[in-house]
């Protein structure tokens, strides 16, 4: 039983650390949402070549965005509007909805990191002290953190859909969107992998709590 408990401790430590690193990397990078305008720019370039001579070159419009800022290909990154200042500015209802959603996921995802830190500390103590209730509490903590991560990611996806619809409504030439590639980036993929790993960590801690409980019952029976 000691061997099994040690294996569970190693698996929990590995998956927990992986989840923390991946989520921290996802939060800190700017490839959650990618807008690729290369096809549109090539089409515009062909039209300019067929027209009067014009040596001016249009700046690329492609961009990639994170939770905090958006970055253009040949320009510096610009921060997104602070969602916690919405009471001080006059915005439309749809824009206020976007700000509320933005403020929600920028709180939830870092909160999941904090939960994992506390879970890591209680998890270390629970294996060190072989405490059944502490193992159980740690498992519940990681499962709660996984749900927080899932909620944050889901709200971000919904936020992106609402922002896209808002942009379509404001765009006069909607046919141009057919030549623009819009997709989620690898930062979001890191967030999903972190969620799965965090969920697995919680399950491993619950399994360790059950294994320790069975071991203690067997020892008492002897």
Swiss-Prot record:
Subcellular location: Cell junction, Tight junction; Lateral cell membrane; Apical cell membrane
Consequence the record notes for mutating residue 54 to K: Complete loss of glycosylation
GO cellular component, one term: apicolateral plasma membrane
Cell membrane keyword on record: yes
Membrane topology: Multi-pass membrane protein
Glycosylated residues (UniProt): 54, 88
Bilayer-crossing regions: 7-27, 105-125, 133-153, 188-208
Keywords assigned: Cell junction, Cell membrane, Glycoprotein, Membrane, Tight junction, Transmembrane, Transmembrane helix
Primary location recorded for the protein, binned into one broad class: other
Protein name, per record: Transmembrane protein 114
Organism: Mus musculus (Mouse)
């Amino acid at each position: 039983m000691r061997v099994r408990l040690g294996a569970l401790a190693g698996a929990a430590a590995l998956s927990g650390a992986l989840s923390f690193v991946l989520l921290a990397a996802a939060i800190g990078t700017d490839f959650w949402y990618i807008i690729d305008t290369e096809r549109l720019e090539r089409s515009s370039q062909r039209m300019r070549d067929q027209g009067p001579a014009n040596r001016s070159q249009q700046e690329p419009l492609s961009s990639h965005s994170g939770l905090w800022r958006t970055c253009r290909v040949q320009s510096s990154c610009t921060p997104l509007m602070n969602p916690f200042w919405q009471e001080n500015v006059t915005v439309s209802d749809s824009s206020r909805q976007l700000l509320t959603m933005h403020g929600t996921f920028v709180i939830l995802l870092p909160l999941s990191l904090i939960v994992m830190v506390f879970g890591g500390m209680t998890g270390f103590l629970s294996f060190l002290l072989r405490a059944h209730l502490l193992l159980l509490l740690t498992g519940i903590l990681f499962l709660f953190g996984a749900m927080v991560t899932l909620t944050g990611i889901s709200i971000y996806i919904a936020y992106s859909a609402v922002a896209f619809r808002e942009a379509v409504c404001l765009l006069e030439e909607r046919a141009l969107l057919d030549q623009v590639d819009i997709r989620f980036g690898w930062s979001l993929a890191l967030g999903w992998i972190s969620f799965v790993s965090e969920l697995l960590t919680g399950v491993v801690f619950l399994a360790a709590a059950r294994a320790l409980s069975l071991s203690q019952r067997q020892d008492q029976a002897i």
